[in-house]
Design a protein with these regions (language model features):
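Class I S-adenosyl-L-methionine-dependent methyltransferase module
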Residues: 174-182
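Conserved SAM-binding loop
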Residues: 169-170
């Protein structure tokens, strides 16, 4: 997750060059304007291919501009992968690169300003990993990726440098699983 202040941790540089599995992929969320930057950065670290993702919301954060212009209701992302297509669990169904963004229910605490819905994260984890695989979230923020991975039967490791987010995620979201959150 990007930090609320707009800074983006060096995900691709730090983790991308260390991935050794046969067909790894990296899924990242970003702003539309960042897509090209992350494609180029991925290529620099061996992720030669990508699949663009669009996450369609039924709401917009730009509500104050609704009477002045068309407002955005999408978030964007990329699936970066090396030489081989990543693992792909589609159960024989066509999967489009545009996903509906369904908000979490009120029982999932909102901890981070860029927190992603658990159901969306579960869907992506189920598509690109198998039970028992490892999911890494280098910007764990709310802990939602770790929770989604655990609920899908995956092992997960998360890293968070902001102590307040770590504490809240540990207390409110991850209290029923055994996370490796640093």
């Amino acid at each position: 997750e990007n930090d609320a202040d707009g800074s983006t941790p060096p995900t691709v540089e730090k983790i991308g060059s260390k991935i050794k599995s046969k067909a790894p992929c990296m899924v990242l969320f970003c702003a539309f304007e960042q897509l090209h930057y992350y494609i180029e950065l991925g290529e620099r670290y061996g992720f030669k291919h990508y699949i663009p993702l669009v996450f369609r919301k039924n709401f917009s954060a730009q509500v104050l501009k609704a009477n002045m212009k068309i407002v955005g209701n999408c978030e964007y992302g990329l699936v970066l992968y090396k030489d081989k297509l990543p693992k792909f669990n589609n159960d024989g169904q066509m999967i489009f690169n545009c996903f509906d963004w369904v908000r979490d229910t009120k029982d999932v605490p909102k901890i981070h300003p860029t927190q992603k819905p658990i159901a969306l994260l579960e869907r992506l984890i189920e598509i690109f990993t198998d039970r028992g695989d490892v999911v890494i979230d280098p910007c764990a923020g709310s802990g939602s990726t770790l929770l989604a991975a655990a609920q899908c039967g995956r092992n997960a490791y998360g890293f968070e440098i902001k102590k307040d987010f770590y504490r809240e995620a540990t207390e409110k979201v991850l209290n029923n699983i055994q996370p490796s959150l640093f």
